[in-house]
Amino acid sequence: MTTTVAVVGATGRMGQLISQIVEASDEFELVASLDSKGELSDMLGADIAVDVTLPAVSQGVVEYAVAHGMNVLVGTSGWTGERITELERRITGNLAVGVVIIPNFSVGSVLATSFAQMAARFYDSIEIVEAHGASKIDSPSGTAVRTAELMSQARGSRGPVQAPHTDQRARGQQVASIPVHSLRMQGVVAKQDVVFGGNGEVLTISHDTLAPSAYEAGILLALRATRTARGVVVGLDRLIDMDGSRERATQTAPTGAASGPVDDGGPSGQAATVTSA
């Protein structure tokens, strides 16, 4: 049985990509395509809604869907920790709906953010440089915001990072005390560098999205999770086996137990590097 999908923001790049993936899948059926200014009532009747609109529009789309008992997959930037906490309060007690918020559908990007979160405990000088195509309106990106927030959480008692001269505009926007610098230019799909400065060394965790195909696996994974989600789920990392515990559980299962498919291929359309100088 297929799951019907309504895409809000279907005319944008991500909306077009998600629509193509849905139409090509045997698991899902596209039943409504709305632009960011479309009538939200047009998505009613679908099993799940996908919001890939604009930061100023996204919250209204999600609230409308939740109010009508629809699960929502959110791929729009601008969902800060404060907005997510507010959303969690709104749907507390409503066990019938779920909202899955994915700042970045790229598996490589999620891994790079996880590596940065690990490194944040060991360095006090940290900055983020992110780049996207010239058509991306908002800045900093949702990925950069989530990376900064997760690194800040990981630092715990170490407190805020060292960020001198942040009163100067060229020093970037501070997110969770971490300076973030945003580039918007032609020829770029998506790129993020997290730079850590230490005593006599610099560590850079870098991820480049080279083609939209980098998002396909993550989009399908998120769509599947949205079907049965309850409450608020944030990040692709919540949906994949980040620490290998699920795989180990499968390997130790009794003989004859069913195991999931194994993909030995690396993610397409992306490149990740960790460098230390």
UniProtKB/Swiss-Prot annotation:
Gene3D superfamilies assigned to the protein according to its UniProt record, in alphabetical order: Dihydrodipicolinate Reductase, domain 2, NAD(P)-binding Rossmann-like Domain
Record keyword S-adenosyl-L-methionine present: no
Which terms does the record give in the GO molecular function aspect? Answer: 4-hydroxy-tetrahydrodipicolinate reductase; NAD binding; NADP binding; oxidoreductase activity, acting on CH or CH2 groups, NAD or NADP as acceptor
> Which residues fall in a coiled-coil region?
none
Keywords per UniProt: Amino-acid biosynthesis, Cytoplasm, Diaminopimelate biosynthesis, Lysine biosynthesis, NAD, NADP, Oxidoreductase
Q: GO biological process annotations for this chain's record?
A: diaminopimelate biosynthetic process; lysine biosynthetic process via diaminopimelate
Active site residues per record: H132 (proton donor/acceptor), K136 (proton donor)
Source organism, top-level taxon:
Bacteria
- Give a Gene Ontology cellular component term annotated to this protein: cytosol
Where is (S)-2,3,4,5-tetrahydrodipicolinate annotated to bind? G142, T143
Q: What is its main location?
A: cytoplasm
Q: Which pathway is recorded for this entry?
A: Amino-acid biosynthesis; L-lysine biosynthesis via DAP pathway; (S)-tetrahydrodipicolinate from L-aspartate: step 4/4
Binding-site residues for NAD(+), renumbered to this chain? G9, A10, T11, G12, R13, M14, G75, T76, S77
Looking up CDD domains in the UniProt record yields:
DHDPR_N (cd02274)
Give one Pfam hit by family name.
Answer: DapB_C
Region Disordered: which residues?
Answer: 245-277
Tell me the residue numbers annotated for binding NADP(+): K37
Query: Subcellular location, in the record's words?
Result: Cytoplasm
Give its E.C. classification number: 1.17.1.8
- Glycosyltransferase as UniProt keyword: no
According to its UniProt record, which reaction does this protein catalyse? Answer: (S)-2,3,4,5-tetrahydrodipicolinate + NAD(+) + H2O = (2S,4S)-4-hydroxy-2,3,4,5-tetrahydrodipicolinate + NADH + H(+); (S)-2,3,4,5-tetrahydrodipicolinate + NADP(+) + H2O = (2S,4S)-4-hydroxy-2,3,4,5-tetrahydrodipicolinate + NADPH + H(+)
Family of the protein in this entry: Belongs to the DapB family.
The protein's job, in short, is: Catalyzes the conversion of 4-hydroxy-tetrahydrodipicolinate (HTPA) to tetrahydrodipicolinate.
Q: What is this protein called?
A: 4-hydroxy-tetrahydrodipicolinate reductase
Organism, as annotated:
Clavibacter sepedonicus (Clavibacter michiganensis subsp. sepedonicus)
